[in-house]
Amino acid sequence: MGNSVSWGECAEFNPKSELPDIFEYVDLESVVGTDILSHRTESKSSAPSRAQRLAQKGDVFYQTVRPYQKNNCIFENDENNWVFSTGYAQLRPVNDGYFLLTLLQNEDFVKLVLDRCTGTSYPAINSNDLADIDVNIPINNLEQQRIGDYFRNLDSLITLHQRKYDKLTKVKKAMLKKCFPKMVLISLK
């Protein structure tokens, strides 16, 4: 595929930053798949101690606890007041974040991570061990970007079709209720 490099060469890990007084907090339950589904407003003075990773647009967040769940995301928001839990490794990509996210979601990569995890009930990897894992990446930055864009577009299509499916399922359920309002199931004895 290209060059074998460590993750530490692909991204800056856990960049230092000063937290804002009020921020939107993303904990480990907030990300499902590659989507941020929820967040909550916190103040710096009363926030959980794990609220430490100030997000910047384009940052990739990798769930270091139970990484087999593949709840990792790219932060696409322009706002500068979002903070993630230290349960995520924060990767600030050297090149294309979507390409890195695609690699992180790859089952072979997950196996490499699990081999380096500690703990059995809640396997976890620390950011330094994650940064030391070697990956093969294209030398050409444009190729990385095209690969990342390709998989981002596929993910968008999947999401769109999932929403259509969910909507049609609700329509079907409503129509069945309307067409058969008093249908009673009769059990034979």
Model region roles, listed by residue range:
Residues M1-K189:
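Feature detects amphipathic, helix-rich regulatory segments
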